Design a protein with these regions (language model features):
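Loop/helix patches that line or flank the sugar-binding groove of alpha-linked glycan CAZymes
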Residues: 133, 149-172, 182, 369, ...
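Aromatic-rich carbohydrate-binding modules that target alpha-glucans
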Residues: 26-78, 85-104
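Substrate-binding/active-site clefts of carbohydrate-active enzymes
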Residues: 138, 142-192, 199-323, 327-328, ...
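Short catalytic-loop micro-motif centered on adjacent basic/acidic residues
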Residues: 241, 333-339, 438
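A structural motif
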Residues: 191, 331, 380, 460-461
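Active-site-proximal helices and loops of the catalytic beta/alpha 8
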Residues: 230-238, 248, 253-264, 323, ...
């Protein structure tokens, strides 16, 4: 009985539809043969002895340690008390309720306060997802490397297209016009959602070091070009998701340059996490590494000072940006970079702004680990599901785990979240942050197809990294950004 577990008002008990709850129970693997839900209205317990009415629960999946049981249940008056009748293979029969495990005897069944509760089916608290997100096939574009549609905006020193494998500071001239020119190609692929890496003004080729969040990078086009891109996407039934880098800014932003110039007297001094003035660092072995940094940064990159999202001025600034691109350009989704290093307090405000701006907006967080805290319905709809797809790659491609272990890991991830979340989790096999799938598969295109087919059949929505469809290869960043 020590493995028996349930937690009310969580992924174990949640409103799935306005009048239906999903209730889950965890037990030790291959220990329990039969589970029933005892449930009824909390105000009629003594009147009707409703605990004598039992609903069968179904074992839905297993991990290497646990079995998971589930049932869908409604309630006439939209409130529910419930407990569990559990029978093990060795003949033990127990009642499990809010106070723990008891013998399955009348005196314990009549303990009103020993039942879990869903006090009321609050529609406002139900985890809602955009319906369109469940049917989306995403295509990730690294704008600087997808297609050069307008050579007139090429940055200085641009290299001939495809002339060499990229270094960290190379430019090849990809832009938004290049995407517009290939939208029909994407439609032919079956794509109906584009996830763009950052397109805002920045110093680097990857644009994660933002200078101005309200301007398209001039090497990619301008705001009018982007507006036309969104309109052309929507004509073709393609949703548009932008990448928001709200954990940090670039060190050539006017805010950070003011801090460098004016130190603690800068009006932006509290916009960042600065531990000592003047701001300084010692260069490391490469452009993106440093040590003895006097301010907090992304990783150890001195060129990406971390934003202080506890500062109300910073919050207002970032929330204005979130609303601006939705209202002015009609984007459909935000992908949030380094989302786990920004406060929950801020993300809750961000979610409210997005919901107010557009009814069916989708929010995706970049989180590489288990993400329950962010997926309670008041922050994100989904995360980049690396924890899920890592298991697939470890089994199919790297041959590091058994099939049984892969299934266990996949099922464990599914049971961390509500059904709604699982329907829109972002199943991504490779990206601008990882080696290319074909490279991991050692050039075996048949294996690559098998992995993609298996992944695309799982719960969640697939994302294809640009160029994978033509067999593009590449090791870790920057090689994966050809």
């Amino acid at each position: 009985t020590t493995a028996i577990y349930h937690r009310p008002e969580s992924e174990f008990a949640y409103l799935y539809e306005k009048d239906k709850m999903h209730i889950r129970l965890r037990t030790a693997r291959q220990d329990v043969r039969h589970v029933q839900l005892l449930c009824g209205d909390p105000y009629t317990l003594y009147k009707e002895a409703w605990y004598q009415q039992r609903i069968e629960m179904k074992k839905i999946l297993s991990t290497d340690l646990h079995d998971y049981w589930q049932v869908s249940v409604g309630a006439e008056f939209r409130r529910l008390s419930y407990g569990f009748s559990i029978e093990s293979y060795d003949g033990l029969h127990v009642f499990y309720g809010d106070h723990g495990v008891y013998p399955f005897e009348q005196q314990y069944l009549e303990m009103n306060n020993n039942y879990f509760r869903m006090p009321y089916f609050q529609e406002a608290d139900r985890f809602k997802i955009p319906e369109w997100a469940k049917e989306t096939v995403w295509y990730q574009i690294f704008p600087e490397r997808f297609a050069n549609g307008d050579p007139s905006n090429d940055p200085e020193g641009v290299l001939p297209w495809g002339s060499k494998n990229p270094d960290r500071q190379d430019f090849f001239g990809g832009d938004l016009q290049g995407v517009i020119d290939h939208l029909d190609y994407l439609v032919d692929l079956g794509i109906n959602g584009i996830y763009f890496c950052p397109i805002f003004e920045a110093y680097s080729n990857h644009k994660y070091d933002t200078i101005d969040y309200l301007a398209i990078d001039p090497a990619f086009g301008d705001n009018d070009t982007f507006k036309r891109l969104v309109e052309e996407c929507h004509k073709r039934g393609i949703k548009v998701m932008l990448d928001a880098v709200f954990n940090h800014m670039g060190d050539t932003s006017h805010q950070w340059l003011d801090v460098i110039k004016n130190g603690k007297d800068s009006p932006f001094a509290d916009w960042f996490h600065i531990n000592e003035f003047p701001v300084n660092y010692k260069e490391g072995e490469n452009f993106e590494d440093a040590y003895d940094i006097t301010y907090d940064v992304f990783a150890f990159t001195p060129h990406m000072p971390k934003l202080n999202t506890e500062n109300p001025d910073v919050q207002d600034y970032l929330l204005k940006i979130a609303r601006y691109w939705i209202e002015e350009f009609d984007i459909d989704a935000w992908r949030l970079d380094v989302a786990n290093e920004v406060s929950h307090h801020f993300w809750k405000k961000f979610r409210q702004v997005c919901d107010d701006a557009k009814d069916d907006f989708y929010i995706l967080g970049e989180i590489w680990h288990s993400s329950q805290r962010w997926l309670q319905g008041d922050e994100f709809h989904a995360v980049m599901n690396y924890a899920f797809t890592d298991a697939i790659i470890e089994y199919f491609v790297k041959d590091e785990i058994s099939m049984t272990k892969m299934v266990s890991e996949l099922n464990n991830q599914l049971m961390l979240y509500r059904e709604q979340t699982n329907q829109v989790q972002f199943n991504i096999l490779d990206s601008h942050d990882t080696p290319r799938l074909l490279t991991l598969a050692r050039g075996d295109k048949d294996l690559m197809r098998q992995v993609m087919a298996f992944t695309y059949l799982q719960q969640g929505v697939p994302c294809l990294y640009y160029g994978d469809e033509i067999g593009l290869t590449g090791d870790m960043d920057p090689d994966c950004r050809k």
